[in-house]
């Protein structure tokens, strides 16, 4: 990841990155962008980015909706509120939990200068790693929710939709990457999710805690991917999206 969206320096750095987009990627990256435009068609590549951003927006919106349902539906609201209250009583436990998302193991640049050195190809690889890392969690999420007594249709339908959107977004990013770097093999090295045992636990508190953490981490990563895509779109095309991107911390 460029930087975790929960990291303060990420929030401070990205607006500067967007404002200085015309000064960035002037060397190798600018050459690669012109190569893409000449050989593959700028319009088609932009269409792929537009499609990716739409899929990303839909995924983020559904994730927010689903998290809100978990807090409001009788199926899960009491458990989720208890988790929040327990966090308020034990800040150390809260920080440890919310900093243990499986994708947080990805390397990140620490400075603006390091971020400027990230190529278009490497940004796309980061997005692929994030999306790949969610394939198994989203599969098991949908499976386990169907086995949980009282899980409402509103949650089940959205779980399926998010999994489908994640797969479609991954396919779209791979199409973009194949045009940026033709013939490149897909990287299968991505962060592994290790909370399956907790999600399948017979102890309800443990199981719902796994659900809470999963949706917190999913919320962070859908936000991350969405902003990376808008950042790349701004870098490549300098269009209206540069002024439409907003940065804020997950509530």
From Swiss-Prot:
- The glycosylation sites are 57
Expression across tissues is: Expressed exclusively in the placenta. Expressed in spongiotrophoblast cells and trophoblast giant cells of the junctional zone and in labyrinthine trophoblast.
Keyword annotations for this protein?
Disulfide bond, Glycoprotein, Hormone, Secreted, Signal
| Protein's UniProt keywords contain Disulfide bond | yes
Molecular function terms, GO-annotated: hormone activity
**One Pfam family of this protein, by short name?**
Hormone_1
The entry's cellular-component GO terms read:
extracellular region
Give the location in the cell. Answer: Secreted
Q: List the disulfide bonds.
A: 101-217, 234-242
Q: Where is the signal peptide?
A: 1-30
Where the protein is mainly located, per its record?
secreted
**What PROSITE patterns does the record point to?**
SOMATOTROPIN_1 (PS00266), SOMATOTROPIN_2 (PS00338)
InterPro entries registered for this protein in UniProt: 4_helix_cytokine-like_core, Somatotropin/Prolactin, Somatotropin_CS
Origin: domain of life: Eukaryota
Give the family, as the similarity comment puts it.
Answer: Belongs to the somatotropin/prolactin family.
Q: Which PANTHER family match?
A: PROLACTIN-7C1, SOMATOTROPIN,PROLACTIN
What is the protein name for this chain?
A: Prolactin-7C1
Recite the lineage of the species.
Eukaryota, Metazoa, Chordata, Craniata, Vertebrata
Annotated gene: Prl7c1
